[in-house]
Amino acid sequence: TGINPLEGTDQYASISQNGKQVIQYSFKTGKQTAVLFDIDDTQGAKIDNFDGYIMSPDGKRMLIRTKTQPVYRRSYKAVFYIYTMASRKLEPLSDGGPQQAPVWSPDGTKVAFVRDNNIFLVKLLYNNSESQVTKDGLFNHVINGIPDWVNEEEFAFSHALTFNADGTMLCWLRYD
């Protein structure tokens, strides 16, 4: 997934050449400064490989993307895991099936995502409790939180949901 600057630091992260780690580097020296994720050094769930990651805004966790399946040009479904760096704990984001378009809350304590055209919310501070936000999603009729094919293609975006600045509200587009 290339070079990803780490917010509020002079560091960046990148997936290792062997695809087993997320490595932190210094922009100034280009040298490795830390291993942020190692597929062979986790507690809890075990995975054999991963396709990408999304760092939380507070830099304490990341979403690890596995089993990626393309939908359109930019969008995909995948099985995501929550990785907590301090404890090295790896746990599924959801047990309900592949997810699309996950987004972190600004404080890194919640993750919203789309599954089957509906939006779900996972609260990390409440034992990763999952709640369904929308219930009207219907294939080829109602789409919540992700763009339809035309909007993804013409406007080059694959996410249509976000949190407000303090993370207390979720905003999304609904297509019907």
What are these regions (language model features)?
Residues 1-176:
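Beta-propeller folds
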